């Protein structure tokens, strides 16, 4: 498996993502590589005959539409046979895990609001409408959160962020939940999903 995460500036990979890759590698008894989209240069990797490219991305933004096909082409150019899986946010079991995550929230259902990274109009917007129906709660872009909470001050923010980032930290300071991989149930469920891949 080659996991693809957003990463931080300079290609740094959050510790919770590295720990996830280690746990999956141990359970599968096979190498699990991890790559950050923010890396300035592609990581060196051992020559593997076949790789499953697993985008641990929650939304279908430009990374999903442009960067992932470029990574696949790069790996194919290195002689690997690559299978690119859909982004994590499109997996039905993952959406079920998000529903369970919401149901475990301490906030009353009417106060729950999922806050996500802002996206450009287009396919991402359609996905967000679909996800809002699936989760039965409002989804608000992070850059609109301040306005939203002024209109609905009792709202409880739940960050749609796999690893801690600026958005999740700001929301946590406002009384929101932790990033998804900081939730033991989500972390364990994602490990199980990745271990079950061929």
Show the residue positions of the predicted features.
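Active-site-proximal alpha-helix that buttresses catalytic centers in soluble enzyme cores
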Residues: 1-198
């Amino acid at each position: 498996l080659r996991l693809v995460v957003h990463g931080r500036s300079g290609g740094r990979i959050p510790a919770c993502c590295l720990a996830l890759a280690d746990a999956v590698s141990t359970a599968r008894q096979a190498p699990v590589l991890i790559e950050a989209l923010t890396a300035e240069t592609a990581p060196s990797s051992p020559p593997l005959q076949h790789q499953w490219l697993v985008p641990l991305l929650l939304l279908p933004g430009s990374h999903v539409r442009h960067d992932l096909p470029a990574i696949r082409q790069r790996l194919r150019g290195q002689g690997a046979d690559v299978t690119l899986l859909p982004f994590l946010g499109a997996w039905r079991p993952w959406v079920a895990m998000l529903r369970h995550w919401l149901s475990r929230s301490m906030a009353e259902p009417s106060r729950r609001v999922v806050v996500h990274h802002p996206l450009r109009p287009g396919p991402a917007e359609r996905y967000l409408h679909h996800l809002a129906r699936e989760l039965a709660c409002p989804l608000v872009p992070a850059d609109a959160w301040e306005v939203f909470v002024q209109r609905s001050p009792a709202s409880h923010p739940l960050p749609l962020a796999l690893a801690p980032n600026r958005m999740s930290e700001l929301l946590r300071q406002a009384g929101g939940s932790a990033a998804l991989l900081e939730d033991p149930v989500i972390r364990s469920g994602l490990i199980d999903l990745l271990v079950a891949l061929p």
